[in-house]
Amino acid sequence: MNKASPVHADMHQFEVKDTQLQIGGYSLDQLASMLDKQVFYAYDQTVVKAQIDIFHRHIPASIKLHYAIKANPYMPLINAMRPWVEGFDVASQKEMLMAIQSGMPNRDISFAGPAKQLPEIRAAIVAGITLHIESELEFERAVKLGQELDIKPIIAFRVNPAFELKASGMKMGGGPKQFGIDEERLFEILPTLDYSQFEFRGFHIFWGSQNLKQEAIIDAHNNTFALAQKLIDITPTPTVTVNLGGGMGIPYFPGEKRLDLAPIGENLKQLLKQYPQLAKLELIFELGRFLVAEAGIYASRITDIKVSRGHTYLMTNGGLHHHLSNSGNFGQVIRKNYPVAIGNKMGLAPEEAKVSAVGPLCTPLDTLADKMQLPKAELGDWLVIFQSGAYGPTASPQDFLGHPHVSEILV
């Protein structure tokens, strides 16, 4: 008996009316008319809010939620999320300015990322946001700039933990890493620092992202709390905050299922009891794609249909220049398909023959869907890529080959 092939998770986050996909109550044709564009990203803010509600339903209320702007820095989205989260995490001076202009209090904004340049460090100090220090030299530069500006820099140390997140889509801790300061080195230097030269906030322990295994995340949380307690114990000044990282993923590929936060939340409740000193601090989860990826779609028009030696290609006006991660060139080792649909033929039975969807670029890498079963496609149909609310336009080479940039809309 043949084993059934794995399938994508159900994309049930959007409404469908008469076979027409709805984003924020609008059909794709309506969105196209509103934008006067035939290829675009659309984000449904009710889906973002639903993801935030899922987080709060399961995670202890004492743990704050910050949005990592890098996942999607679309300004209308940032503004919409401002009242829904308790802080923003940024990775550049531009993102810092976006966060400030949203109205988020500066003390609820943190700046992480390796190789920060002097103008970025200076801007963060002047703005009064928390710098997540990634190296000893970066710390020295921040202190020196603070002295020159006569402003104490607000500093938290990003920790490169010795443990590593199992089954992580992107490992950002454990072993040698460009991120943070090795935990064993922090144990050496924290007792020796002159804390009068800066405002010490705490620690940022980030171990990975895009994980769909609650057992692995629970294990990482256990290690994170234990490490945070050790760091607090050897730091000769009070700790205010600990950023616990993120790590929570969303299902992109066949066989993947949505993460169950219930056991993760129950374990966190036990950890708060086990570590009463930590429970009194400001604890933060920093999430990006978990909050916004499910809320976004990428829609392009099918403008040509061709058959090459028996295989059908749906030719579209969109491609990897707009959506690099979907093409498999943003971290995948072996390309796998995102969930794909014909957006104006939702619910219709797929044809038996598999088809591929491609874009206009002169490279075989420009593949939107590879050998997938879809309803019978016609010219003018909408090809929709789900799970596209994170790492989309700003993570893609939009100037490659000179094609037009993609439009975005939040509804």
How would you label these PLM feature ranges?
Residues 64-66, 87, 106-110, 130-132, ...:
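Structural preference for beta-strand elements that scaffold enzyme active sites
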Residues 2-9, 161-304, 400-403:
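Active-site loop/helix belt of alpha/beta enzymes
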Residues 26, 43-46, 50, 72, ...:
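Conserved active-site and cofactor/substrate-binding residues in soluble primary-metabolism enzymes
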Residues 278-411:
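Charged (often Lys/Glu-rich) extended helix/loop segments that serve as interaction or gating elements
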Residues 48, 70, 92, 124, ...:
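Conserved, mostly hydrophobic/aromatic
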Residues 73-76, 97, 164-165, 209-213, ...:
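Flexible loop/turn segments at secondary-structure boundaries
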